[in-house]
Structure formats: C-alpha cells, structure tokens
A protein has these predicted regions:
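Alpha-helical transmembrane segments
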Residues: 124, 128-159
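Membrane-embedded alpha-helical segments that form the functional core of polytopic membrane enzymes
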Residues: 47-103, 120, 137-144
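Select subsegments of transmembrane alpha-helices in polytopic membrane proteins
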Residues: 47-52, 108-116, 235-243
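C-terminal membrane-associated helical module and adjoining short loops/tails
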Residues: 1-32, 158-243
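Basic, amphipathic juxtamembrane/active-site segments
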Residues: 91-133
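Small-residue-rich segments of transmembrane alpha-helices in multi-pass membrane proteins
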Residues: 56, 60, 107-122, 166-177
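Short juxtamembrane and helix-loop transition motifs at transmembrane-helix boundaries
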Residues: 8-17, 34-44, 70-73, 96-104, ...
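A cytosolic-side transmembrane-helix exit/cap motif
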Residues: 93-102, 154-164
Length: 243
C-alpha cells in the first residue's frame, strides 16, 4: 500500500501542471508514458533517447499511410499513438530524473513536426495520381497551419507555466537567448547542436512573431525584476493566461 502511494506521488510529480494537462493526456498518454519513463529509468535511457525513438515511430507511421491498405494504415495509426506516448514519456522521464537539456527541449519541439511532415508527405504522394497538383496546395496549407498552431499552443502553455511555476517549471525561451547560444558554438565542433539551435531559434521567432503582446510583457517584466516575479504578478498573469 505504501509502495502504491509513493508510486502515485511520483506519477503526479511527472506532470507539468493541472492547468495545462489535456483530458486525453491525463487518462491515456500520461499513465502509459509514466510506465515507459519508469522502464527508461531502469534501463538508464536518457529522455533524448525516448524522443528519438518517438521520431522513428512517427516517421514509420507516415510511411505506412502511403499504401492503399487499411491494415497497414491501421498499423501506421498505432505507431503514431506510440510516438505520442514517447512524446509524453520523454518529458516525464526528464522531470523524474531532473535530466533537462537545451537539446532535449529542441528535439521535443521538433519531433512532432518531423512525424507530421512524414505523414503529410506520404498522404500527398498517395493521392497525387488522383488529385494531381491540387493535393500539394492542400497538403502545404494544412502542414503550415498545423505547424503554426502547434507552436502557438506550446508557447501559450509555456508562458502560463512560467508565471505559475516560475522559470524552473517552464521551458519558455526567447529568440535572443537562443540566437546567442547558436552564435557561441561552431558547426565544426558541434554540428548537431548547431543545427538544432538554428531550427529552435527560428521556432521561437515564429512564436514571438505571432504573440507580440506576450513577448513585450515578458520583456517589460524582465527589465523590472529579472526572472523573479512577485506573487501578485504571478497570480494575476497566471489567471489571465489559463488555457
């Protein structure tokens, strides 16, 4: 009984915040992700390893959307669900083991974009013989709007967590800081990190471009009090930014 209580407490410690957790996550993805995170901890896996596994599963899911076979398509859908489980488990493992890294944040940010690029591309190729060039216009429009929506949802979520949990409980970054990190390293010395930071830099710029008021608010607050926010400000802005 005591062990179950400890396990339950540990599970809840891997969640971000009740304000930002979606119903399907709480009932499905988080519990399964927690089991995967426990397995990863036992096997000494890093959160980035689980993220990479999710990327592979997501790409495979897209490839299985290409054949006109319901059986293969259903397998592809199952792989997409497993990729989503990995997307949950990597963050849970990071919070469980306190294994945070900029590279992990970058990989986590672009992983779902890579899956859906694979899915959109393979679906477009599947329907091209019947739809012709029009399928590409539809696919590009859907992919771009999807990417922007996902980036905005992530930004609003992290912005809210910044005021509710503080800097340590949020993954909110700004493009200037990311750009500084990007320029501080050479491609020759750290090619993977350099390339990852380039993508993440532009990802944060897109977020700030579509949310200029939030960016200005954070800059003003930083000029006044740095990253340490007063309880009053945290409560007011946290309430105003509820999802």
């Amino acid at each position: 009984m005591k062990h179950l209580k400890q396990l339950r407490e540990r599970y809840f410690s891997t969640l971000k915040h009740s304000d930002t957790e979606e119903t399907i996550d709480l009932w499905f993805y988080r519990p399964i992700g927690f089991l995967v995170a426990l397995l990863g901890e036992r096997l000494n896996l890093t959160p980035n390893a689980i993220t990479t596994a999710g990327i592979v599963l997501g790409i495979a899911s897209g490839l299985l959307m290409f054949p006109a076979s319901l059986k293969l398509n259903l397998i592809g859908f199952l792989l997409l669900v497993l990729a989503d489980v990995c997307d949950s488990a990597d963050g849970q493992l990071a919070r469980m083991t306190k294994s945070y890294s900029t590279l992990g944040r970058i990989l986590d940010g672009v992983s779902s974009d890579i899956w859906f690029a694979s899915i959109y591309l393979c679906i477009a190729l599947r329907f091209y013989p019947e739809w012709g060039i029009g399928i590409w216009a539809l696919t590009i429009g859907a992919a771009v709007s999807h990417a922007i929506q996902a980036a905005m949802a992530d930004h609003y979520r992290q912005f809210h967590l910044f005021f509710v949990n503080g800097k340590g409980g949020s993954e909110l970054d700004d493009s200037e800081s990311v750009a500084h990190d990007y320029r501080s390293i050479s491609f020759k010395a750290e090619p993977v990190r350099k390339l990852s930071l380039w993508f993440y830099w532009h990802y944060t710029k897109v977020q700030e471009t579509f949310n200029p008021q939030m960016t200005r608010l954070r800059v003003c607050l930083r000029l006044q009090s740095g990253e340490s926010l007063s309880p009053t400000i945290s409560e007011l802005v946290g309430h105003a930014t509820l999802p």
